[in-house]
Amino acid sequence: MKLVVVGVSGRMGQALVRIICETQGAVLHAAVGRPGSASIGRDAGDLAGVGPLGVPVTDDALAAFVNADGVIDFTRPETSVEFSALAAQARIVHIIGTTGCSPADEARFEAAARHARIVKSGNMSLGVNLLSVLVAQAAKALEASGWDIEVLEMHHKHKVDAPSGTALLLGEAAAKGRGIDLTEKAVKVRDGHTGPREPGSIGFATLRGGSVIGEHSVLLAGEGEIVTLSHSAGDRSIFARGAVKAALWAQDKKPGLYSMLDVLGLSSPH
């Protein structure tokens, strides 16, 4: 499968190049960097530390998508929206690991999915997606009247969005288990005299510092006991492996908007 990596200059982009090189059935077709980036013109393999691959980094996404089978995208919401439109035009696979997307962005992805095979997730790792299933089960089993749900996450100091896409994914899983709408029940800020905790709400706490790749915990707090479900990411390659796995999975699927739960066979039967 001929894959394009966009945002190749970043840490995730370079991790993707390395994983593609070691994955049977995948090959790096093109690599896209930001216009004006110092990486433009450099060999993507050299950039990722795997040696020359004969794939120079370009800032022309349209040309890069020609004759490709799929694109893997951990960039920014505004660029992911642009890439989804290009993927739809090219009728190819688009794997989106970008977080911090707005409802308007999500609507654009849904529109693009009429022609592209899009897999979008706040986290591409197997462990986190399994965790989300367990969170939904726990939230369903432990009733809101006696159990409060809090989502705690920590990331490196350079992360620009909060709560993380993974924290929101886990919050959505908890809300699904409870049969509620997360947008109505989420509490993302607590400051000053907040009063008692709102019954049935799902709280979020965000920590930033150092080089932490990703730590997530979902706490279900009852009277006299706490159940904690957690995941720790020790290496960015777990996200890259999941993204490449998703691309290979989506290659023979119909156009549509899929999640990593679909890729991993963890989605609920429809």
From Swiss-Prot:
Protein name from the UniProt record: 4-hydroxy-tetrahydrodipicolinate reductase
Asked whether the UniProt record includes Transcription among its keywords, one would answer no
Q: Report the superkingdom from the record.
A: Bacteria
UniProt enzyme class: oxidoreductase
Annotated compartments: Cytoplasm
Family designation: Belongs to the DapB family.
**Do you know which InterPro entries this protein is assigned to?**
DapB_C, DapB_N, DapB_N_CS, DHDPR_bac, NAD(P)-bd_dom_sf
Q: Name one Pfam family in it.
A: DapB_N
GO cellular component terms given for this protein? cytosol
Instruction: Give a short account of what the protein does.
Output: Catalyzes the conversion of 4-hydroxy-tetrahydrodipicolinate (HTPA) to tetrahydrodipicolinate.
Q: What does the record give under GO molecular function? A: 4-hydroxy-tetrahydrodipicolinate reductase; NAD binding; NADP binding; oxidoreductase activity, acting on CH or CH2 groups, NAD or NADP as acceptor
Q: Does the keyword NAD apply?
A: yes
Q: Which residues bind NADP(+)?
A: 34
Cite the entry's keywords alphabetically.
Answer: Amino-acid biosynthesis, Cytoplasm, Diaminopimelate biosynthesis, Lysine biosynthesis, NAD, NADP, Oxidoreductase
The protein's Enzyme Commission number:
1.17.1.8
Enumerate the residues binding (S)-2,3,4,5-tetrahydrodipicolinate.
156, 165-166
Residues annotated as binding NAD(+) are: 7-12, 97-99, 121-124
Biological process (GO), any one: lysine biosynthetic process via diaminopimelate
